[in-house]
Amino acid sequence: MAATRAGPRAREIFTSLEYGPVPESHACALAWLDTQDRCLGHYVNGKWLKPEHRNSVPCQDPITGENLASCLQAQAEDVAAAVEAARMAFKGWSAHPGVVRAQHLTRLAEVIQKHQRLLWTLESLVTGRAVREVRDGDVQLAQQLLHYHAIQASTQEEALAGWEPMGVIGLILPPTFSFLEMMWRICPALAVGCTVVALVPPASPAPLLLAQLAGELGPFPGILNVLSGPASLVPILASQPGIRKVAFCGAPEEGRALRRSLAGECAELGLALGTESLLLLTDTADVDSAVEGVVDAAWSDRGPGGLRLLIQESVWDEAMRRLQERMGRLRSGRGLDGAVDMGARGAAACDLVQRFVREAQSQGAQVFQAGDVPSERPFYPPTLVSNLPPASPCAQVEVPWPVVVASPFRTAKEALLVANGTPRGGSASVWSERLGQALELGYGLQVGTVWINAHGLRDPSVPTGGCKESGCSWHGGPDGLYEYLRPSGTPARLSCLSKNLNYDTFGLAVPSTLPAGPEIGPSPAPPYGLFVGGRFQAPGARSSRPIRDSSGNLHGYVAEGGAKDIRGAVEAAHQAFPGWAGQSPGARAALLWALAAALERRKSTLASRLERQGAELKAAEAEVELSARRLRAWGARVQAQGHTLQVAGLRGPVLRLREPLGVLAVVCPDEWPLLAFVSLLAPALAYGNTVVMVPSAACPLLALEVCQDMATVFPAGLANVVTGDRDHLTRCLALHQDVQAMWYFGSAQGSQFVEWASAGNLKPVWASRGCPRAWDQEAEGAGPELGLRVARTKALWLPMGD
């Protein structure tokens, strides 16, 4: 009997050249689920935990809806057990030499290589992502990450001398992130000696499989623990006493809520928020290559978010035409089909993008959809949104996958204004055949990663991160290692949580100031105003506060600054920032050296002021001399603000740039009134920031003496000094939305408030939590920690090719 024809003949295939299915068997994934009796628990301390009386959620194929397994949901006691297991494992893991940790990471990479088919099949089956992206991208990069960080671990004692591991790290991942994002964060943490407790979303078997592979290697079972649970467990994990740092990935609003809930807690917080990226297409670009870049950025399964596309007006019509043609050739389908470009993200993601597109249409946007896409849910076609009014709500919110929002621009300056006008600062690519134009745009973009004529390239040796509301945590390269280290000898962060602190009233009112009697002493202080915009000026409140010496005698009066004065100081700092950041390192160094020389000329006056505050004359003179040396030291360091990385496997360098934060608010400590002020001022200015500073509340006169020299040495607005009630000024600065970062060296309650208030614009915060700092010691007063906190990293990729 003749065979039944089940498909097209070979001749017809060669005539039509149409795609056919290339299915990948998922038998190995189902077999692994069978070993768990189709019931997944948690992997803690090297073994599976399946506690009784726990709720479970189904793990389903997002396309067919088939139930693959059930996943137990963790509760608070499970979280506590996992943290305790990680804490116990940390004692042995961190004590071992880096070479031992390197060997363990290398063995884990080998195990992943042996079981890579199981890993990519399971990930594609459960998430719906295209299997070729997982197989050829994620799994291979996961192995590279382990090998790279094994090398870093083996050289830790020499390369990272002076640093020690933080402890137990809590990792929190959202449903939209793949297992690779977990690898980006656990690899550096494990390499430097930390242990990890990861909280993954319900029905996420791939991270559990990775934990099993790591736990079965042998002597270090508790270094990686994975729990599956709902979002309600996030604050429970983050507030565990044993957790030293929380690495959170998710939406900006979730990050804000976590920032507020962790204010005053012992755990540090690293945020990686949002998924949207940006692509700039100029009129000198190779349009066809740029169109492929759009496809890689928005309509592949590499990234979890959408894309904002800026196209120069002169090539708008041509670029849109070619982009729409390319969209018509995209294929969507089951993730295990090796011939599809896009898989599916599940019903929740489909609902999100449908709402976004409906709202965009209601706001006047044009929507174009194309591609070979199955009609049933949860598939959604590639979508191109254009003509969206700039002031519409959809132009401000994050773009979901698989949507591209396209907008025109006329000049490079306008492109930077539009691109930097959003609160997000994750990643971007610039497409231009003119290197000068590409570098100008790349340097001007306020993002963490920039690719030139490419998009989405990643390498373990290159740092990846963001700025603004995309968070300020990093992974990859040396920056990723420092995320999980603290300076050796410094005590672990202690909780300064005060449950009685009222955030609504803290620092709201300024205590009344009354006449304090006659000034007593050989050298009464001259009347100072606020140093704003390069000159002294009267405070808005037209009020002054008395300053007393160590004997309780009246030493002088300083201006009582308030919210209006802080607003003026921040505006002056913003006006000065572009010019100062654009100065060459040599020019900035010269001005710092000039200020150091001015301090030395004023040595006797400054020493006498310190002597009235209780310091001995020799100690006072030594503080002035050390302050001048600090200025010169940071002036010398300013010359080395970045270096070049040569990436293996790619032709071309990656520039690791150290860029200024912007306007930096600094609240100085009471102790070391001159040295602490200079030690915080010098690195901030050296790296191109402008500052608004609140000097020592006990003796602000020394900082105001320095301001007399800054008025003649520095450009106007570079450094602004506001005196007054510390709590009130702290409140004004912490709540200010145009302050890019804040350092606070004051009380425990003030530290808690600053951490809580920083959630407004998610500014990075460095708070002392009421602990004193040895400013006269090199490690604490001028160590590498200051250099890391005073600037942010930008990775600028310059790949070469045809």
Curated annotation (Swiss-Prot):
SUPFAM superfamilies reported for this sequence: ALDH-like
Pfam families: Aldedh (PF00171)
GO molecular function, one term: aldehyde dehydrogenase (NAD+) activity
Entry GO terms, CC: membrane
Family of the protein in this entry: Belongs to the aldehyde dehydrogenase family.
Quaternary structure annotation from Swiss-Prot or TrEMBL: Interacts with SPG21.
Record protein name field: Aldehyde dehydrogenase family 16 member A1
Organism: Homo sapiens (Human)
Taxonomic path: Eukaryota, Metazoa, Chordata, Craniata, Vertebrata
